[in-house]
Amino acid sequence: MKVGSLVQSRHDPGYHGIVMEIGPEQTRTDHGRRACRVQWFDGDETFEFIKMLEVISEPAS
């Protein structure tokens, strides 16, 4: 998983978003690079544990 990856929630497979940041400053102290910031297609922006997301597509290098 990297910035720009298209992801979906493991708990709600129809819920898609784009990874905006990995290891954001707000979660870095407690969770290091195990969390990311996701911009969901419904307009919400949340912090998620990477293991709770499934990568659908990664951006080309």
Identify the residue ranges that each predicted region occupies:
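Basic/aromatic-rich interaction segments and small domains that mediate binding to polyanionic partners
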Residues: 2-59
